[in-house]
Design a protein with these regions (language model features):
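C-terminal motif of bacterial Sec signal peptides marking the signal peptidase cleavage site
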Residues: 17-18
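Hydrophobic face of alpha-helices
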Residues: 7-8, 149
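Bacterial N-terminal signal peptides that target proteins for export
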Residues: 1-7
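Short, conserved catalytic or interaction motifs in soluble domains
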Residues: 21
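Penicillin-recognizing serine hydrolase domain
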Residues: 31-44, 143-294
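Active-site-adjacent loops and short helices of periplasmic peptidoglycan-processing enzymes
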Residues: 24-187, 197
Length: 294
């Protein structure tokens, strides 16, 4: 009996020793990698970088400030138009001569009374940044021009925009035309771009490298320079985008890019030069690439 008790005590002691001498498992601390934010070319620039699928914001600077969006507002015009028109709808051009800036004026000018398929009109507005085509979308809309502008502002609010206030479909800003309230923050533009990218047709158009009007082969257009392999601004990550410029807005650029299998939206407003929009966009894409790789 004593022998059994002694054996039991010995076993218990050995087990206790084994437990106390076992080294605790050390948990490896996850290394925190600090990625420096890029220094952009212009101090007053407004910029946002957003994931097109999740809405996650990777970078923001002056993102809530109201700015003039120039022709980037045509992304919002496209959202309204794509829900109303069909590809084979023929639209009639009106009031073309009222535009102070006409992009087709030197190559195959647009005149009042032309009948142009919606497919040509939407491509012309997004790829050529044609103010004539933006005006045509508004003039043929239900409720006419004013109805289109109202629909743009309503759609912006529905998306969640808080600083959008548009008075025309093309983004021009002229005091004598009453076009000085055309405002939008870069945060709002990123939300518009995100909503835009959800639409399969618009996504295809914005990623088209070049397009020729079916109704007039002399009207040809190309996407932003960052998609052109022969351009000094070429970046293989960039799928497509929308440029913008007025004296009040400065240089603006919205792009869609693929970074680490994610679709990334970049928005820059109020740059001094076209070159700055491209170089800052590249810096922002490099920054997101480093963040996703960390």
């Amino acid at each position: 009996m004593k022998f059994r008790k002694w054996i039991g005590m010995l076993c218990a002691t050995l087990m206790l020793c084994a437990c106390t001498t076992k080294e605790p498992v050390k948990k490896e601390k996850k290394k925190v990698v600090s990625i420096p934010k890029p220094v952009l070319n212009t101090e007053n620039v407004s910029a946002v970088v957003m994931d097109a699928d999740t809405g996650k914001v990777y970078y923001a600077k002056n993102e809530q400030e109201s700015r003039y969006p120039a022709s980037t507002i045509k992304l919002l015009s496209a959202l309204v138009a794509i829900d109303y028109y069909k590809d084979d709808d023929e639209l009639t051009t009106r009031n073309i001569m009222s535009l102070p800036d006409r992009v087709f004026i030197h190559t195959a000018p647009v005149y009042d009374g032309e009948r142009i398929p919606f497919k040509d009109v939407i491509h012309g507005m997004l790829l050529k940044s044609s103010n004539e085509m933006a005006l045509t979308l508004a003039e043929n809309y239900k409720g006419g021009y004013d109805g289109f502008i109202e629909a743009m502002n309503k759609r912006a609010k529905k998306i969640g925009c808080t600083k959008v206030d548009v008075s025309n479909p093309h983004g021009l800003s002229y005091a004598d035309k009453g076009w000085l309230k055309e405002t939008c923050s870069t945060k709002d533009m990123a939300l518009i771009a995100k909503e835009f990218y959800k639409n399969k047709k618009l996504r295809k158009i914005i990623s088209t490298e070049s397009y020729v009007f079916e109704s007039n082969p002399n009207r040809e257009m190309k996407n932003v320079k960052m998609t052109h392999k022969d351009s000094t601004y070429y970046d293989k990550r960039v799928i497509g985008g929308k440029t913008g410029f007025t004296n009040l807005a400065g240089r603006c650029l919205v792009t869609y890019s693929k970074v680490k299998k994610r679709t990334i939206i970049t928005v820059v407003f109020k740059e001094n030069t076209r070159q700055e929009t491209y170089t800052d966009t590249k810096k922002l894409l490099d920054y997101v690439n480093d963040l996703l790789a960390a």
